[in-house]
Amino acid sequence: MASHRPRSNKAANGASTSPKRSWIIVSAALVGFCALIAALDSIRSSFYIFDHKAIYKIASTAVANHPGNATAIFDDVLDNLRADPKLAPYINKNHFSDESEWMFNNAGGAMGSMFIIHASVTEYLIFFGTPVGTEGHTGRHTADDYFNILTGNQYAFPAGALKAEHYPAGSVHHLRRGTVKQYMMPEDGCWALELAQGWIPPMLPFGLADVLSSTLDLPTFGITVWITAREMVGNLLIGKF
């Protein structure tokens, strides 16, 4: 008759401690990752090259100089940015009149087009808007977002508000990090100089998800990924995080 040896206590203890050891390793790695993220987040502003107050001054001055003229305003804004030697190396070298640099953006139910002036890990600066109007969800983001209105009007409201916030040309709409609103650009059009400061990569899925789940506009997806990567990687290579 075959006999069965009882499993040794040593083997049993080894088997029981193995999952515990794995959980300890995973937990330690998770704590370390969270600590790293918290440390980086505490110094994120040290990576910024833009001052949102200076951007507002550039935008509002351009609006005052060329009221209602989007082309002249865009030129004025870019001329001022490129005239600053601290900013010029990090600005898109192409002109906004180059149609290949523009792309549609479908996000949160809204649709507009954008021109990327700057993109890096902690900041982006774009022209964004539409001449025909749109409305949608702002998204809940890992960055502060400053919409400097150049032409037209933007309206927004947070859940619970009974009246809309109104942002005319020359004003700035600050969407604070982690907050969310519905926003609308009327049918007569609106263009904005949008500055985001915080962690940009986590925002990218919001800006790209509609292409994959709804519009299936793969050429636009490709252009968006290519130009964003070109600017981000290019800036990383010259020391802009």
Curated annotation (Swiss-Prot):
Pathway: Steroid metabolism; ergosterol biosynthesis; ergosterol from zymosterol: step 2/5. Its main location: endoplasmic reticulum. It is found in: Endoplasmic reticulum membrane. InterPro entries: ERG2_sigma1_rcpt-like. It is a single-pass membrane protein. One of its GO terms (cellular component) is endoplasmic reticulum. One of its GO terms (biological process) is ergosterol biosynthetic process. GO terms for molecular function: isomerase activity. The chain crosses the membrane at residues 23-43. Belongs to the ERG2 family. PANTHER family: SIGMA 1-TYPE OPIOID RECEPTOR-RELATED, SIGMA NON-OPIOID INTRACELLULAR RECEPTOR 1. This is C-8 sterol isomerase. It comes from Mycosarcoma maydis. The gene is ERG2.
